[in-house]
């Protein structure tokens, strides 16, 4: 994969989080974000993904 999805995989692996269900969940988040950014050149994918993850209880330790 190229683009944001590939970046997510790298970030997840670098954090030592290799759980497949988590990877799938993050891919789903990325796909939603990619759909939302269509037609908008100013959409900040990474900032929005961080905002999504920031508000997920399972990611509290990332703070």
From Swiss-Prot:
Keywords: Copper, Lignin degradation, Metal-binding, Oxidoreductase, Secreted. Induction: By copper ions. One of its GO terms (molecular function) is hydroquinone:oxygen oxidoreductase activity. The keyword Iron-sulfur does not apply. Its cofactor is Cu cation. Lignin degradation and detoxification of lignin-derived products. Oxidation of a broad range of substrates including mono-, di- and polyphenols, aromatic amines and methoxy-substituted phenols accompanied by reduction of oxygen to water. Monomer. This is Laccase-C1. It comes from Cerrena unicolor.
